[in-house]
Design a protein with these regions (language model features):
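Surface-exposed, interaction-prone regions used to assemble/regulate multi-protein complexes
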Residues: 1-140
Length: 140
């Protein structure tokens, strides 16, 4: 898997000198899956909290290309609606261990054959295997 970023502290991305805190400064809007093109776009928008820097990107997309695996584990039945868009953690994890969906590894870059797993505060988990992840950023 080729990626354009490093994962920092399992909740943020480092990209071209920018620290992008997906847990605190961005809300997950949803994902678009184009099965024919084997592409998944994970969509994020800047949080409205007063702690978010004014010069933070307005939104971003993590575009997964040549997807060969997708697993979505639904959120908890008693999830808090406010938490549904909040990323808990993000991790690369070996695709050989797909039965394990509740652990993370503190690695900044993927190893050969890794999946990427997005853990949300709501209990939802999205696991993807692809050839490339591109980070697309938008400014106001």
């Amino acid at each position: 898997m080729k990626v354009e970023f490093d994962i920092i502290d399992n909740h943020a991305l480092s990209f071209e000198g920018h620290h992008i805190d997906l847990h605190n400064n961005f809300d997950f809007v949803g994902y678009d899956y184009n099965k024919a093109e084997r592409q998944i776009k994970m969509n994020w928008k800047k949080s409205s909290g007063d702690w978010v820097r004014k010069y933070e990107f307005s939104s971003l997309i993590l575009k997964h290309s040549a997807v060969t695996f997708l697993k979505v584990i639904d959120q908890d039945q008693i999830g808090n609606g406010e938490e549904s868009g909040c990323l808990g953690e993000i991790s690369f994890f070996p695709s050989s261990e797909r039965e394990v969906n509740d652990q993370l590894l503190p690695q900044s870059r993927p190893n050969e054959g890794d999946d990427i797993i997005y853990f949300f505060e709501s209990g939802q988990c999205i696991r993807i295997h692809c050839e490339k992840i591109e980070l697309i950023i938008y400014k106001d």
